[in-house]
Amino acid sequence: MMNAGQPTLAAYLILGAMLFSIGVVGVFLNRKNVIILLMAIELLLLAVNINLVAFSRYLGNLDGQVFVFFILTVAAAEAAIGLAILVAYFRNRHSINVDDIDELRG
């Protein structure tokens, strides 16, 4: 049960939908910078996590909140690996432009 003055499930779902929409717009409109693309993908994952926590709290089940910890762990590893690859790519090519990445050579 939620106390008076606390946000409802709908408020959390609207927040999650807004964050997800911003992330989708960031992925589709950004065609230049890989770092912004990675940030938009992380925003998508954050929106999903907010929805999982909201439903978990609403239903009184902790499974969604525990699952969020696993998602955050995978997202942190993905971001670390992505940034490491990006740093190595920048050292070789001196660019982080998305258009330049499609040409990989051995």
Swiss-Prot record:
Belongs to the complex I subunit 4L family. The keyword Transmembrane applies. It comes from the Bacteria. This is NADH-quinone oxidoreductase subunit K. GO terms for cellular component: NADH dehydrogenase complex; plasma membrane. It is found in: Cell inner membrane. Its EC number is 7.1.1.-. Its main location: membrane. NDH-1 is composed of 14 different subunits. Subunits NuoA, H, J, K, L, M, N constitute the membrane sector of the complex. It catalyses: a quinone + NADH + 5 H(+)(in) = a quinol + NAD(+) + 4 H(+)(out). It is an enzyme of class 7 (translocase). It is a multi-pass membrane protein. NDH-1 shuttles electrons from NADH, via FMN and iron-sulfur (Fe-S) centers, to quinones in the respiratory chain. The immediate electron acceptor for the enzyme in this species is believed to be ubiquinone. Couples the redox reaction to proton translocation (for every two electrons transferred, four hydrogen ions are translocated across the cytoplasmic membrane), and thus conserves the redox energy in a proton gradient. Keywords: Cell inner membrane, Cell membrane, Membrane, NAD, Quinone, Translocase, Transmembrane, Transmembrane helix, Transport, Ubiquinone. The chain crosses the membrane at residues 9-29, 35-55, 66-86. The keyword Cytoplasm does not apply.
